[in-house]
C-alpha cells in the first residue's frame, strides 16, 4: 500500500486520505492529517529509539526523532518532497533542537566498533513524551535532554509542546539550556 501511495504521488495522483489526528504512543509519533496536508511529529523517549543506520542508509538521521516536524502536501505537489532528504541540513531539521557542531557519531564505523554496535540509542533518564487527541485535534509534549549514554556531552535540555488544530499548529518551547553555544 505504501509503495502504491508513493508511486501515485510521484505521478501526481494523490488522494486526501483520512482526515484527523492520532497519537501513536508506542512510537512516540503524532500524525495530523487534513485534506491538503499532513503533519508528522516524531519524538523520542526512553521507550523508543533514534533512527538506525543500516546498510549505509540513514547515516545522518540521528536527530530525526528529536521532535522533527514534517509537513507534507497531500495533493499533486507531494511528489517534489520525495527527493528532499538529499538536500536537508541534518542538524537543522524543522522542529529539532540540536548542537550544530555535534558529529554524526551514530554510524561512524570506528565509534560503532568501539561501542560494540550498541544499538539502539535511547534517551537519558527523565525524558517524557506524551500526547492527547480527540481524533480531530491533538496536543503532544516532549521533554528531553542530550548528554548521557551514546549521545554527545552537550548538556542540551528542552521542553516542547505542540498543539494541532484544524488550520493552525502552535509549537511552544521552554527550559532550553546547553553546555555548548
Predicted regions and their residues:
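Extended polysaccharide-engagement surfaces of secreted carbohydrate-active enzymes
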Residues: 1-181
Amino acid at each position: 500500500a505504501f509503495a502504491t501511495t508513493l508511486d501515485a504521488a510521484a505521478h501526481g495522483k494523490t488522494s486526501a486520505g483520512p482526515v484527523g489526528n492520532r497519537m501513536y504512543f508506542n512510537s512516540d509519533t503524532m500524525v495530523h492529517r487534513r485534506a491538503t496536508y499532513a503533519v508528522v511529529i516524531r519524538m523520542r523517549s526512553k521507550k523508543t529509539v533514534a533512527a538506525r543506520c543500516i546498510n549505509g542508509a540513514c547515516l545522518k538521521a540521528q536527530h530525526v526523532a528529536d521532535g522533527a516536524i514534517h509537513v507534507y502536501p497531500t495533493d499533486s505537489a507531494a511528489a517534489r518532497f520525495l527527493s528532499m532528504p538529499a538536500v536537508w541540513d541534518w542538524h537543522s531539521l524543522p522542529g529539532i533542537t540540536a548542537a550544530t557542531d555535534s558529529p554524526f557519531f551514530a554510524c561512524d564505523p570506528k565509534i560503532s566498533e568501539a561501542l560494540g554496535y550498541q544499538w539502539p540509542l535511547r534517551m537519558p533518564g527523565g525524558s517524557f513524551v506524551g500526547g492527547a487527541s480527540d481524533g480531530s485535534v491533538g496536543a503532544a509534549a516532549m521533554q528531553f535532554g542530550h548528554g548521557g549514554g551514546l549521545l554527545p556531552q552537550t548538556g542540551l535540555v528542552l521542553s516542547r509542546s505542540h498543539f494541532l488544530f484544524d488550520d493552525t499548529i502552535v509549537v511552544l518551547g521552554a527550559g532550553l539550556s546547553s553546555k555548548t553555544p
